[in-house]
Regions:
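Conserved beta-strand-loop-alpha-helix junction that forms the acyl-donor binding cleft
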Residues: 89, 111-122, 138-142
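Conserved beta-strand in the GNAT
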Residues: 54, 62-71, 78-83
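Conserved acetyl-CoA pyrophosphate-binding loop and the N-cap/start of the following alpha-helix
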Residues: 88, 92-100
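Conserved GNAT acetyl-CoA-binding A-motif
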Residues: 98, 104-117
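Conserved acetyl-CoA binding element of GNAT-fold acetyltransferases
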Residues: 75-86, 113, 145
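Conserved GNAT-fold acetyl-CoA-binding loop/helix
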Residues: 14-43
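A short beta-loop-alpha structural element at the N-terminal edge
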Residues: 1-15
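A short helix-loop-beta-strand connector motif used in the catalytic cores of GNAT acetyltransferases and
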Residues: 41-54
Length: 151
């Protein structure tokens, strides 16, 4: 079940973030990525200004197994930290979370980004109607694609 996260969910969401983004760190060969260094106080600040959704597994004691967040900024909705517990991946939960966060911002322009190496992420976003509008080189080893969709 997908629903709005509460403040008391934030420690569990941060733990999920640390677990889920290990895959990205391995893919990039870089364990120094922001999602793995974020502190609870930073997540709490994001929570105050944005929308957080959580996916709970009713079969696992209502454990939080997925999450996504978004904030309206600079005329667009910035979607970020779309994550699913590694044991729950490949079941359509990422797509469900993306659709749910989009439903919170009907009629708006949504923007998100991912590494060019994250082929599965790019495939998911493109299949959901997102299109690349910019590629940024962060370093010789790291590039991000920025994608957008008008809801």
């Amino acid at each position: 079940m997908i629903c709005h996260a509460e403040a008391e969910d934030l420690p569990a969401i941060l733990e999920l973030q640390y677990l889920a983004y290990r895959t990205e760190a391995e893919l990039l060969g870089n364990w120094d990525i922001p999602p793995l260094k974020q502190k609870l106080s930073e997540v709490e600040e994001e929570f105050r200004t944005g929308v957080f959704l959580k996916l709970i597994s009713e079969n696992d004691g209502d454990a939080i197994v997925g999450s996504v967040r978004a904030v309206e900024k600079d005329g667009a909705v910035q979607i970020g930290k779309l994550m699913v517990h590694p044991q729950f991946r490949r079941r359509g939960y990422g797509r469900m979370l993306l659709s749910a966060i989009e439903a919170e911002f009907a009629g708006k322009r949504c923007v998100l980004f991912t590494s060019t190496r994250s082929v599965n992420n790019i495939r998911l976003y493109e299949s959901a109607g997102y299109r690349i509008f910019e590629t940024r080189t962060i370093s010789p080893e790291l590039k991000f694609v920025y994608m957008e969709k008008q809801l």
